Amino acid sequence: GDVLVTPLQVARFMAAIGNGGTLYRPQLIEKIVGPDGSVSATFAPEVVGALPIQPDRLKALQDAMVNVIKNQRGTAFFRIGEMPIPAAGKTGTAESSIPGSPHAWFAGYTFNSFNGKPDIAVAVIVENEGEGSDFAAPIFRRVLEAYYFGSPQVLYWFESGFGITRTPTPFGGIPTKTPKP
């Protein structure tokens, strides 16, 4: 039968895998800061459950998800394997109601607090587009680059079709011209 899950539910599940099994209530606001810089309210994370998994199996799952990105045989290696951000994830390709046009999924999380920022979990779905490794995984990488570096670091092959003609400036460098497809 059909599996009905939202990207938020998948991201929450990824966060729990990454943090050792704790499920938190999703929240959008950490604190409220006034114009003078004073904090008028803070919102602590709320634990609402735990994943029903043994620690050794959770560790095996985490290791497998790192290999999806870092192992040359991993499904996301060729799209995001050289990314410097420590991350783990899973590609997915889901059937759609349009024959030959599956939904592309990628979900994952970061670890080791890269660049001094807190870890995050992200779920990406690109409907009716293709394989998760081809379309959703590069978007996952883009989200991480925007979060940790403030801008994307590479231009993907499919972006030239959107009218993007220059590679984003990596770490303050000079952008380069993108070849025509």
Residue ranges and their predicted role:
Residues G1-G49, M65-P152:
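Active-site beta-strand/loop architecture of penicillin-binding DD-peptidases
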Residues Y109, S160-G161:
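Short, isolated positions within intrinsically disordered regulatory regions of eukaryotic proteins
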Residues V154-E159:
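Short alpha-helical interdomain "coupling" segment at the junction between an upstream regulatory sensor module
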Residues G161-P181:
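Ser/Thr-rich, Proline-interspersed low-complexity disordered segments
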